[in-house]
Amino acid sequence: MLAVLLPALVLLAGTHAEPAIAQDRNAVARARMMAEIAAMARETAAETGRPRFGDAVMAAMGKVPRHRFVPFVQELFAYENRPLPIGENQTISQPYIVALMTDLLDPKPTDTVLEVGTGSGYQAAVLAELVAKVYTIEIVEPLAKRAIRLFEQLGYRNVEVRIGDGYGGWPQAAPFDSIIVTAAPAEIPKPLIDQLKPGGRMVIP
């Protein structure tokens, strides 16, 4: 049986050393972001059916350094609960949406997950904290190359990036325990359905 979930609303040790003051500031801002995500989950529970997100999902969200996934000029706003521009006419998703879609995916430590639409790489990094392997596809080459560099810098060795049209999936790595699509297609691409394991789960806006 295939479960396709439609959200009701609408990533080696790191080589980037930060001063202790900046680390403290980011930790405080990240904690505030997590509190806002939890509050928004309660506020939207009637629409999503999820008054709270799983502990593992929240722990992953609280660990990933979102400020590394946005341009320098946006770092000050990295832990605000809103999307931000990342260049190439693309955005990094609102943290609440990342948490919601990740929770809907119900990731397990042994899972192999396909992400369609790498973008900044932030969603893939969150998944990498939760599952065994993440395959992610990005059609915008500069974004894909930037994400590859970030994954290397941050030590996400369980993330593999491909440049191309994600709606065709990644047949060589299939089948997948779950698939997450970060942008809404006109219809659910059949190749993605075909590449899900029996009983697999797809989260798609």
Question: Over which residues does each language-model region extend?
Answer:
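Bacterial N-terminal signal peptides
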Residues: A3-G14
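Conserved nucleotide-cofactor-binding alpha/beta core module
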Residues: L104-P205
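Class I SAM-dependent transferase core
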Residues: E18-L114, L130, K145, R149-Q153, ...
